[in-house]
Amino acid sequence: MANVALLGCTGMVGSHILTHLLGNSSVARIDTISRRTPQPATAAPQEKLTTFVSDDSSKWASQLSSLTPTPDIFISAFGTTRGAAGGFENQYKIEHGLNVEMARAARDAGTKVYVLISSTGADKNSSFGYPRMKGEIEEEVKAMGFDRTIILRPGLISGERQESRPAEAVMRGFAGLVGKIHSGLKDGWAQDADVIAKAAVNAGVKALNGEVPAGSEKVWVMYGKDIIQYGKGQ
């Protein structure tokens, strides 16, 4: 039975991750750290869910470090947008800074498996800010030396977002339409948030049990086809 900590539990993918963790019989305890109370905790008491809610993100790492029992798996689906942050510089400080800080706190606490929801095209050498930020987060996390590091690189994430992203909403709508015709037409470039979430949970639990693909014993990077496999077929 796994103890899991989750960062980003109120976002598009993270909320689905929480739902799958709650429904997974291999998960004994879930700790979430967030600015807002996740919906499952507001709907009804959840026996295996403990929430820490604070607007002061400087307290998050110490909260993670103090969790008892220590999480076996730490999952980060945390991210923000340029608009919400007030520009890319602030987005970088928040998204890169908190992801790296929380990963380090998890490692130092003794967490064995780290799971990151990243993005297709993540590249620390990119000339574009967003993929460069994602790539830098990946590289810094990999260097921390968790027993297992899992990085999911989904394409366009389809589903319903709470915040407004008009251009992305058009593409999500198109992905949904194409997916209704045949799922294979969109699986290569867009994945449903729920499918990504299930893949993250399944991969994390399998990695904790030592069930990883050959050659991915330390770092397992999951692309679209892998996400579909573990999010739909497992």
UniProtKB/Swiss-Prot annotation:
Keyword Mitochondrion attached: yes
InterPro entries: NAD(P)-bd_dom, NAD(P)-bd_dom_sf
One Pfam family, short name: NAD_binding_10
GO biological process: import into nucleus
Gene Ontology CC, one term: mitochondrial outer membrane
Keyword Membrane: yes
Subcellular location: Mitochondrion outer membrane
Highest taxon of source: Eukaryota
Membrane topology recorded in Swiss-Prot or TrEMBL: Peripheral membrane protein
Keywords tagged on the record: Membrane, Mitochondrion, Mitochondrion outer membrane, Transit peptide
Main subcellular localisation: mitochondrion
Transit peptide, UniProt annotation: 1-36
Similarity comment text for this entry: Belongs to the FMP52 family.
Protein name in UniProt: Protein fmp52, mitochondrial
Species in which this protein is naturally found: Aspergillus niger (strain ATCC MYA-4892 / CBS 513.88 / FGSC A1513)
